[in-house]
Amino acid sequence: MQYRSTRGSKENTLTAPQAIIQGLAQDGGLYVPVAFPQANFKLEDLSKLSYKQIAAMVISLFFDDFTKEQITTAVQSAYSEQWDDRSIVPIEKHDNHFYMELFHGPTLAFKDIALQMLPQLMTRAVQIEKIAKDIIILTATSGDTGTASMRGFANQKGTDVIVFYPEGGVSPVQLKQMLSQRGNNLRAIAIKGNFDDAQTEVKKIFNDDSFKNRLNANGYQFSSANSMNIGRLVPQISYYLYTYGQLVRRQEIKLGDEVNFAVPTGNFGDILAGYYAKKLGLPIKKLICASNENNVLTDFFNNGVYDKRRKFHLTNAPAMDILVSSNLERLLFDLYDENNYEVASLMNQLTQRGHYQVSGEVFTKLQKNFAAGFATEEEVKSEIKRVYNYDRYVIDPHTAVGSFVANQYQKKTGDQTPMVIVSTASPYKFPETVYEAITGGPSMQTGVGAIKELHDELGGQLSIGVRALFDREPKTEKIIEPNDMEKEISSILDLK
């Protein structure tokens, strides 16, 4: 299968391994299939397949340059003993909603689903393409991607990981995870600014030809672990298919019944994977885009205008503290019938003016497939408390955003289609907020201390990923200005 840029010519294509290695297109666009694949499965098959089988099926569908053996071994390595639940994605039913738990991997967040797989794909892609250079994984993070990419690529030969995150813009647990990851090829550096500042600078560095020439001369090549990388996005399609199959298997729904998914959304990768699952034939009625107070996407889906010219909020759901959602570009490419000129024009408007408006036809398509809402910080805490009071089920702040917006949507529309909440992180990643929500009083601790405090309140057994946090001492945090990121990379790699 061939891949093209959302902003480039249909004739300028790459193979899947090339797209995975390159990460971001040279014109600033994102890689998408030249022809979206036809499903290689029947809907009734999904209830009979394990998560690993569905993951292998999806990867072989989108990345057919890899052999069956390469995909099988990649899946086995990605979804092995590092997961604390053998099913990989357990589904819990609470208060008439289904919670798709994506946080049972080593770093306690949904990013593990893709970032345990991406290093496997990257290794095999490098072998296929016979790349002699070391791969530099350059990534901006709002918290979870940094941790998960560092864990996934730790000590991988021929690969270095450089992560930039916003100072004060990640949770204490996320910070400790990044600063205590073990591996001699890992770096995490704070920038003075927010996630959008980090991501914007990363994109600029990716497209700086003179800097890339210096890298090449020193034996290095950039790639990315953000969901901008198609190798990171595709594995996420699997859990939508798996969840639907499990609901059929458990007789919660009948084969062919429609399902809604409420997705806590920041950079738009997770919900885009759901849209791709729908394009493959999964009976999804609505994808509900759930935002925190950085509600640029809520406004976009409700009025067709994307406008980043607004106050940036640091919230208790920090992984969603984003005003520029990169993967939305892939959706626009699809809804504009793969018109790369329209997409490039919209992205230029966003860069130059800070806003754009989609056509009436595209807005109609948005309304057909999506709904949107947001939750304030107080509503997040109230939702955690409400869900806990119902049957002692504990959710993290991001999942609470999804749950709150799902309920808001159902009350507004009366739509009683079965609802799946995409549960994106363990509550122990954000113990301060969860503790305050459940007890009504502030946590007296932060980080690991707050985990102990929350565990004392909740009881039960801590997962492997949570217990690992108690054993590691973090490195000293390094903080730089965003415009010094390129200089920092040069220093780390000792570029001549």
How should these model regions be labeled?
Residues 1-496:
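PLP-dependent amino-acid enzyme catalytic core
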